[in-house]
């Protein structure tokens, strides 16, 4: 492909200064951003006669023009490069999409503080501990904290409504401050110890508890002394399991594995000398990108584009060394205005945890490659069976779900050559049809999916319909209408269940000819069809159940005079669900915020008939 770019003429205008360059294609899109301490030398390397790298060849073939920005230093160039990558998301750069927020444990500032899971803006007053790599790590920690410190974890609405201790008190996981089972002083002491524990000060917590145990024993308060003893033993067991080293502090340990175009960066988050958990990252890597660029790009984007809620440690240990490591170290330190070091040659505890991170990264890549190869083989076999002239790039499958015609939902799931593409999944709430009419539901769903389709839209190569010939005919009719003026249309295939409805006995039906065929029950191509069919079924059922529950909750309560969305929500949250609301007494209903005794009587009468 020729874009008319005159490289020699351009290079005559480039100086040997440090700076950043942006490469554009003929449409004006930025396709690559790079930096160099010597721009002339770096840019000249793209236009040598013998370019060994396939990625570079492809990149150069699409260059229409190049913009250059000079900087005072290589550190400035690194920072500007990162800003441009974040702004333009160029197709030939390594891109890290880390758009998930990080969860924390919140210790609130109430009279009786609570421990809670928190994700998002830190608006509530209190102490935030973390960040944790994922929600599972937070929930695991909260479960552990319940066993160690009898502090409430219930929400305020539930806490204020209690008239007697809940099950957590019976399990010795909460001291029931809601009903005065513990003094404020005792509760505050446990809150203080929990805070110290979350800060990693296990030894101080244990020392204070030992002193309290001895004091209780001296005063012959043996039951209280036994409680402190049990708490100390539990804390010691946990401390032994979590302890990394006495002097590690805050640190990220990163194991890297890169193979066949898939890169995994597995991070161990160590804060206050404890492992908070781990998380794997998979940056988007253009084909034939060398490992040095993958490493540099990941570290640059991960630490410079960090969510404001994610704390950056002073030390990072990584499994690979690369040429620009020290320049990147300086750039991050300058941008964050704090000391930041990257180490690759480590010993003792750090080496042990680095080996663990590398093992996890390697296993993650191998698993992805195995899955990728398996899915690819299934696609190839399906192409052979269907005698297609071109590879399948996109498949979709539709299914309908309802209960006796109630709350009908249609699902559309999407598979590409790597398997399920969940970002493209869609659900359609079906309206205005005769309840239970699956044909009308399918017609509405297919019509809405392809309502404004054109040649530039996302057209599936194959469209599976989970159903028999009747539903397939409806779908084929709609597709014929919507694609009448387009050169390409999807191949429709119905997936009808066999006589006994057992997997492996499915009958497949072509939509255009209505001819049917079957595949062997051990055929990988059939397994691929079953996978997308089962996924569409699952997605439709979960959507239907959610819609049905919402409809039933809403219609039952909001049919009562005086009950709107706000009061309905308060009733369901406070009492735990519709069945609990139905079973509540007038007195219990009246304890819900916003519900008077008169309104409680009205609700009680309406629900009891």
Curated annotation (Swiss-Prot):
Q: Which residues form a coiled coil?
A: none
UniProt family annotation: Belongs to the UvrC family.
Domain UVR positions: 203-238
- Which keywords, in A-to-Z order, does the entry hold? Cytoplasm, DNA damage, DNA excision, DNA repair, Excision nuclease, SOS response
- What SUPFAM superfamilies would the database entry show? C-terminal UvrC-binding domain of UvrB, GIY-YIG endonuclease, RuvA domain 2-like
Q: Which intervals hold domain GIY-YIG?
A: 16-94
A single Gene Ontology CC term: cytoplasm
Q: Which GO terms describe its molecular function?
A: DNA binding; excinuclease ABC activity
Q: Which domain of life is it from?
A: Bacteria
By its UniProt entry, which PANTHER family does this protein fall under?
Answer: UVRABC SYSTEM PROTEIN C, UVRC/OXIDOREDUCTASE
Q: What is this protein called?
A: UvrABC system protein C
Q: Tell me, which GO biological process terms does this entry list?
A: DNA damage response; nucleotide-excision repair; SOS response
Known partners and oligomeric status: Interacts with UvrB in an incision complex.
PROSITE patterns recorded: GIY_YIG, UVR, UVRC
Summarize the protein's role.
The UvrABC repair system catalyzes the recognition and processing of DNA lesions. UvrC both incises the 5' and 3' sides of the lesion. The N-terminal half is responsible for the 3' incision and the C-terminal half is responsible for the 5' incision.
User: Where does it reside?
Assistant: Cytoplasm
Question: Record's InterPro entries?
Answer: GIY-YIG_endonuc (IPR000305), GIY-YIG_endonuc_sf (IPR035901), GIY-YIG_UvrC_Cho (IPR047296), Hlx-hairpin-Hlx_DNA-bd_motif (IPR003583), RuvA_2-like (IPR010994), UVR_dom (IPR001943), UVR_dom_sf (IPR036876), UvrABC_protein_C (IPR050066)
Gene behind the chain? uvrC
